[in-house]
């Protein structure tokens, strides 16, 4: 099947797009050669699909046209007078549909008289012609619009299995129980981006970048005395001109004798590197239930097995930018660097905001993996014969 979509938000020649899809499945358990396994395998099906959808990414209803505004040109005089003129704040955004093409192959099964059943899917999702802002030379006199300049590929899988059964007699009544396990993972990578210089500046992407990458310094302990602090005044001068005992020391990864971000490019990232990734990995859920003699109890757990998190918030650091932004607890006080506590978790107390010791770094990168009890329900089903007496 397919769909043909149009949007008045795009220019006339980019307004329409066709998005087809197709799927196929094969129930192997229905084939004659499979009959010998039918006592164990109740159902086995493989399936595959491919399909495309469109994302409508625009700013406003007519972003493909420039908006011209009247403005007094205060920087120029003509014949001794300030003249009025027209200003084009940005170039038109000549964009069209983002296209999301998903390929999926899956397996459905049920075993042991439908007591064990589940499904597995592996997919590749290509997002083509992603809309991003274009950087233009400053000499142009206006900012660039948006264009379809990026592609991204997401590869992932999803697994779900359920065991559901009944024990016929437990203290005079049957006991029903079930357990469901779900697990999934994905990673997304930029496969095309208009970034010829490999800039690592905020908001920029580059080909080969894994979504969620965290760039930062590698922590190399604390500055422990005034002599070492004097050395860091030179080695780490691009971060701050003055260092003290209890401040963080960073590793010189490229061996050039100074700690800095280089040119903030892939070819010259200075002493920074990828130290983690904020993408949640290996999401899981557990659902269990027991029913007996009218009582039911159900519980749902969910979580993430792997995720890195850089928080950098005032709440995390405790001592922060002045008394009004600080949130100091006893934990912060007990775990802050002093001469008597040189291996503490936090650096010396200071109020320099995100300077010196608060650069993105390995030491304070948090493990954001978790498990939580999302829901638990206890219920009782009133017997019908009781209700009939009401």
Predicted regions and their residues:
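Outer-membrane beta-barrel signature, preferentially recognizing the C-terminal barrel domain
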Residues: 52, 73-117, 145-172, 208-215, ...
């Amino acid at each position: 099947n397919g769909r043909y979509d149009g949007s008045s938000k795009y220019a006339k020649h980019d307004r329409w797009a066709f998005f087809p899809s197709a799927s196929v499945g094969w129930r192997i358990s229905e084939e004659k050669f499979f009959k010998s396994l039918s006592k164990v395998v109740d159902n086995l099906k493989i399936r595959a699909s491919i399909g495309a959808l469109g994302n409508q990414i625009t700013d406003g209803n007519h972003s493909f046209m420039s908006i011209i505004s009247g403005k007094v040109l205060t920087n120029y005089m003509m014949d001794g007078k300030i003249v009025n003129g027209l200003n084009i704040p940005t170039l038109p955004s000549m964009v069209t549909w983002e296209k999301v093409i998903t390929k999926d192959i899956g397996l459905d099964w049920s075993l042991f008289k439908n007591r064990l059943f589940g499904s597995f899917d592996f997919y590749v999702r290509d997002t083509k012609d992603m809309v991003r802002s274009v950087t233009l030379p400053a000499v142009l006199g206006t900012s660039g619009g948006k264009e379809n300049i990026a592609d991204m590929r997401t590869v992932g899988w999803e697994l779900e299995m359920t065991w559901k059964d009944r024990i016929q007699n437990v203290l005079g009544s049957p006991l029903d129980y079930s357990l469901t396990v779900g697990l999934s993972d994905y990673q997304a990578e930029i496969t095309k981006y208009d970034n010829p210089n490999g800039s690592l500046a905020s908001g920029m992407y580059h080909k080969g970048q894994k979504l969620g990458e965290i760039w930062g310094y590698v922590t190399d302990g604390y500055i422990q005395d005034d002599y070492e602090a004097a050395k860091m005044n030179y080695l780490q001068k691009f971060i701050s001109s003055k260092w003290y005992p209890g401040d963080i020391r960073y590793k010189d990864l490229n061996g050039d004798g100074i700690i800095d971000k280089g040119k903030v490019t892939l070819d010259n990232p200075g002493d920074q590197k990828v130290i983690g990734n904020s993408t949640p990995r290996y999401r899981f859920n557990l659902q269990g239930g027991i029913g007996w003699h009218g009582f039911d109890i159900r519980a749902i757990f969910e979580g993430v097995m792997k995720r890195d998190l850089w928080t950098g918030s005032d709440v995390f650091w405790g001592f922060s930018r002045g008394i009004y932004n600080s949130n100091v607890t006893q934990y912060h006080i007990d775990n802050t660097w002093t001469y008597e506590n040189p291996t503490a978790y936090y650096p010396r107390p200071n109020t320099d905001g995100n300077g010196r010791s608060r650069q993105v770094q390995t030491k304070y990168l948090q493990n954001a993996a978790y498990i939580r009890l999302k829901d638990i329900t206890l219920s009782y089903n009133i017997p019908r014969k009781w209700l009939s007496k009401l």
